[in-house]
Amino acid sequence: MPTTTLQIPTADGLADAFAAFPDSGRRHPGLLMYPDGFGIRPVLRDMAAELAGHGYYVLVPNVFYRNGPTPVIELPDYIGEEARSGVMAQVMPLIGAHTAERARSDAAAYLAFLNGRPEVSDGPVAVTGYCIGGLLAMRTAAAHPDKVAAVAGFHAPVGADGPELFSTVTAQVHLGHAEGDITPEELGELNRSLDAAGVGFTSEIYPGTVHGFTMSDTDAFSASGLRRHWDRLLPLLERSLPAG
């Protein structure tokens, strides 16, 4: 599976990125993947390669590029209980500084870059994200409804901007919530907001999961949660994007 590192021009400089894509010589649908707060690392590269194997050109940007290239912070190979507090102390200021205005500006640059790649077929793309990346994915879909056909967020605070964020979303949506992140009552409120905005969506709690359940390099990982993530994400992409 071909992979490469790239530099994406943005309003504030160059964002380094990772890309994985099929080795076919043909053009394929584009997919913008926003990492979780821990950033680009082997587990994200593996997930991008998995998606590329299903026929997509997958672009994974370093959303914290303003603070330096990947790795923005040094991470242990495995983020367990002992390491987590120290890692989070570094990550949270980065998340706090990544404002909605910055996110919208970057999203425009990422989409323009993705759509301009010679390996990417014409037409709308999909956007997926994990943790804070899920919120960035939803912001991207809201800001660019003509360019995003599908959006997925996993263990993501997608409601953080309020229900008005959903008013311009035309993409098909799947949200996979950690059981430890959201109550059934909160899920009902979120789903009613999506309904009211006319969004086509599925939104569910993944049983027995905690925040970060898709990430196999952390103690939050759930093998069953990751399988459900693939079982929901891949059909969404197949329904929403042309065949790769």
Q: Where on the chain are the PLM-derived regions?
A:
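N-terminal cap/leader regions of alpha/beta-hydrolase-fold enzymes
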Residues: M1-G244
